[in-house]
Design a protein with these regions (language model features):
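Peptidoglycan-targeting cell-wall enzymes and recognition modules
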Residues: 4-83
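Acidic helix/loop microenvironments that form the catalytic cleft of cell-wall polysaccharide enzymes
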Residues: 3-7, 87-109
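Short, amphipathic alpha-helical segments
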Residues: 65-73, 89-93, 110
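Short, charged low-complexity intrinsically disordered segments located at boundaries
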Residues: 9-13, 31-33, 102-114
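Long, charge-rich low-complexity segments
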Residues: 113-127
Length: 127
């Protein structure tokens, strides 16, 4: 749901509003590393291990656009850094609250829920 709301599943991967599927701003990316991941070397090593070996050193923010595993890990770390518990995967309103808290403070819950209902909910329907 967050990827759908942030970038329409990739329609806006690299914009002024952030990089990748989760539209992570460069400053937030840097702050996450400096203020959260750096405090836990084991966790930082696991997340860093998801990034490209050489490309990360020359363009760490580009990794958010070209590496889905790394981008998803960073998005999850952004949520984890707020000490927020993940809700049930089929609870769009609870996910919307996380989205607004972590990714889009100005976002409207109903917009997230509408996006979730249009793009994620169909995946839960029986075939």
């Amino acid at each position: 749901g967050i990827a759908a709301s942030q970038s329409a599943f990739g329609a806006a991967l690299d914009s002024r509003r952030g990089h990748g599927l989760y539209r992570t701003p460069e400053l937030r990316h840097k702050q996450l590393w400096d203020n959260y991941l750096a405090l836990d070397p084991d966790l930082a090593s696991r997340v860093r291990g998801l990034a490209s070996q050489h490309a990360f050193l020359s363009g760490p923010h580009l990794e958010l656009t070209v590496n889905l595993r790394y981008s998803t890990a960073i998005a999850l770390m952004m949520i984890e850094a707020t000490n927020t518990l993940l809700p049930a995967e089929d609870d769009p309103l609870a996910m919307a609250r996380i989205w607004r808290t972590v990714f889009q403070p100005q976002g409207r819950l109903r917009d997230f829920v509408a996006c979730w209902n249009a793009s994620v909910a169909p995946l839960y329907l029986p075939a």
